[in-house]
């Protein structure tokens, strides 16, 4: 009995010791190995989980809605609740970010907007004022807009003055596109302005050769012959970077073309490209323009000879145009505009001038009939010529019309000049290369501070070289 009691006591004490050990170790394990940070007691949960309820056939009516919201959140689209929460947070953040500095900035911004509005209204009202002078009215081309405070007159003055603010982009860079003319003793009688594209040259493109540029037939003779009567100015409609080399090829010795102007010297008016001859620094009464675009001569139509664009085919229009231009330059004309306007169709001026010349020749023969009658009669001059061995055929010639004499003289001068160019061509090319080498050494700093070399500087260098060669 006693023995059984001792065994029971040992068993109970062992159980109690084991229970005490177990109770003391559980909190220690929970403290060091649990990842939960919330120390509050967990709420009791039902053993009936969603999986068990689904297997048993029970479904939650709110489950589709929750699933749809879950799918939306998984797809990256916020749910309605999240949207409302986000809007509330943004509104709170905005109210919280509105500081006194922000309020001050808003006040200054509102004051700036108000000042800009008032200044704009005042500026518009000032530009609607009456013309300050007749010079301003003429300069802004507002002759048809009178002074007054009628709405249409005020709007007209406002439009003209606003348009003048943007003339920087539509006007040429310089008021005088050409330097002053040469002294009277060295000056050509007239100035001939000719366009480049589709009059003197024509550019064409194809898949085999690409871009090709051709000279019009008779161009060299046209420029060389008329250069003795006219100051020739090529006024192209294309940009200088594209046309400058072409002009250099047409006149490699700089013997025919006095100046070359390009698109940068044109004026933009009402969306049109206009060549304003009044900016050439030449007398308009002694200036002739030959162009293929109607917009080019819209400001001086009386000075223009319109021509049809050349398409690259063979023609002799330039050569046929020489007699009229030669006649115009060799006559004592003070103003060429009345003569040009006397033609019915200036685009057909070659044919009309040929008809006028034929009538003039017939009239001259009638008026000088006695000269033709005495041409074939024997006289003392024929007898002396036969004694000297001069053929009588060279003496007994029909009298020549003054126009024919002028043309013979012009042709003779042209031939002499061409001969001179051929003989001195290497010398001209060498001098030109020396000038390029001399002025090509100009540094960028010198070009910015002193500018490009002028014509006087180039002439001075040429004179110094000529003097050095003579010594």
Swiss-Prot record:
<comment type="function">
    <text>Essential component of the TIM23 complex, a complex that mediates the translocation of transit peptide-containing proteins across the mitochondrial inner membrane. Required to direct preproteins in transit and direct them to the channel protein TIM23, and possibly facilitates transfer of the translocating proteins from the TOM complex to the TIM23 complex.</text>
</comment>
<keyword id="KW-0813">Transport</keyword>
<feature type="topological domain" description="Mitochondrial intermembrane">
    <location>
        <begin position="128"/>
        <end position="471"/>
    </location>
</feature>
<comment type="similarity">
    <text>Belongs to the TIM50 family.</text>
</comment>
<keyword id="KW-1133">Transmembrane helix</keyword>
<keyword id="KW-0809">Transit peptide</keyword>
<keyword id="KW-0472">Membrane</keyword>
<dbReference type="InterPro" id="IPR004274">
    <property type="entry name" value="FCP1_dom"/>
</dbReference>
<keyword id="KW-0811">Translocation</keyword>
<dbReference type="InterPro" id="IPR050365">
    <property type="entry name" value="TIM50"/>
</dbReference>
<feature type="region of interest" description="Disordered">
    <location>
        <begin position="29"/>
        <end position="101"/>
    </location>
</feature>
<comment type="subunit">
    <text>Component of the TIM23 complex, at least composed of TIM23, TIM17, TIM50 and TIM21. Interacts with preproteins in transit.</text>
</comment>
<dbReference type="Pfam" id="PF03031">
    <property type="entry name" value="NIF"/>
</dbReference>
<keyword id="KW-0812">Transmembrane</keyword>
<keyword id="KW-0653">Protein transport</keyword>
<feature type="transit peptide" description="Mitochondrion">
    <location>
        <begin position="1"/>
        <end position="104"/>
    </location>
</feature>
<protein>
    <recommendedName>
        <fullName>Mitochondrial import inner membrane translocase subunit TIM50</fullName>
    </recommendedName>
</protein>
<dbReference type="GO" id="GO:0005743">
    <property type="term" value="C:mitochondrial inner membrane"/>
</dbReference>
<keyword id="KW-0496">Mitochondrion</keyword>
<dbReference type="GO" id="GO:0015031">
    <property type="term" value="P:protein transport"/>
</dbReference>
<dbReference type="InterPro" id="IPR023214">
    <property type="entry name" value="HAD_sf"/>
</dbReference>
<feature type="domain" description="FCP1 homology">
    <location>
        <begin position="185"/>
        <end position="328"/>
    </location>
</feature>
<keyword id="KW-0999">Mitochondrion inner membrane</keyword>
<feature type="compositionally biased region" description="Acidic residues">
    <location>
        <begin position="71"/>
        <end position="80"/>
    </location>
</feature>
<dbReference type="InterPro" id="IPR036412">
    <property type="entry name" value="HAD-like_sf"/>
</dbReference>
<feature type="transmembrane region" description="Helical">
    <location>
        <begin position="111"/>
        <end position="127"/>
    </location>
</feature>
<feature type="topological domain" description="Mitochondrial matrix">
    <location>
        <begin position="105"/>
        <end position="110"/>
    </location>
</feature>
């Amino acid at each position: 009995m006693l023995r059984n009691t001792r065994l029971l006591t040992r068993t109970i004490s062992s159980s109690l010791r084991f229970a005490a050990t177990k109770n003391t170790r559980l909190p220690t394990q929970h403290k060091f190995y649990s990842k939960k940070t919330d120390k509050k007691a967990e709420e009791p949960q039902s053993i009936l989980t969603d999986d068990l309820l689904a297997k048993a056939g029970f479904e939650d009516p709110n489950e589709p809605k929750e699933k749809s919201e879950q799918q939306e959140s998984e797809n990256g689209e916020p749910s309605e609740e999240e949207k409302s929460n986000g809007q509330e947070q943004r509104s709170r953040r905005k109210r919280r970010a509105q500081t006194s500095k922000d309020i001050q900035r808003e006040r200054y911004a509102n004051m700036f907007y108000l000042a800009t509005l008032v200044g704009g209204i005042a500026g518009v009202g000032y530009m609607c004022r009456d013309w300050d002078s007749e010079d301003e009215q003429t300069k802004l081309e507002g002759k048809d807009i009178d002074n007054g405070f009628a709405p249409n007159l005020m709007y007209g003055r406002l439009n003209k003055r606003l348009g003048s603010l943007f003339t920087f982009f539509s006007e040429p860079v310089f008021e005088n596109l050409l330097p002053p003319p040469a002294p009277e003793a060295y000056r050509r009688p007239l100035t001939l302005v000719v366009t480049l594209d589709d009059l003197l040259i024509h550019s064409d493109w194809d898949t085999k050769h690409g871009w090709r540029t051709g000279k019009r037939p008779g161009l060299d003779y046209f420029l060389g012959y008329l250069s003795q009567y006219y100051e020739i100015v090529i006024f192209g409609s294309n940009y200088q970077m594209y046309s400058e080399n072409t002009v250099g090829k047409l006149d490699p010795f700089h013997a025919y073309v006095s100046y070359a102007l390009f698109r940068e010297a044109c004026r933009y008016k009402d969306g049109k490209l206009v060549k304003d001859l009044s900016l050439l620094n030449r007398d308009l009464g002694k200036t002739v323009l030959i162009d293929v675009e109607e917009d080019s001569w819209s400001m001086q139509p009386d000075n223009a000879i319109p021509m049809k664009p050349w398409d690259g085919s063979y023609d002799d229009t330039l050569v046929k145009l020489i007699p009229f231009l030669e006649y115009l330059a060799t006559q004592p004309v003070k103003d060429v505009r009345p003569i040009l306007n006397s033609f019915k169709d200036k685009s057909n001026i070659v044919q009309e001038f040929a008809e006028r010349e034929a009538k003039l020749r017939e009239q001259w023969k009638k008026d000088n009939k006695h000269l033709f009658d005495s041409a074939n009669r024997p006289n003392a001059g024929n007898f002396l010529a036969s004694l000297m061995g001069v053929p009588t055929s060279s003496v007994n010639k029909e009298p020549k019309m003054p126009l024919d004499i002028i043309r013979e003289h012009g042709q003779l001068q042209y031939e002499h000049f061409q001969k001179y160019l051929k003989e001195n061509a290497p010398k001209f090319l060498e001098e030109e290369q020396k000038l390029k080498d001399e002025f090509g050494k100009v540094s960028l700093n010198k070009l910015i501070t002193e500018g490009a070399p002028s014509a006087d500087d180039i002439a001075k260098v040429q004179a110094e070289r000529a003097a050095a060669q003579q010594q």
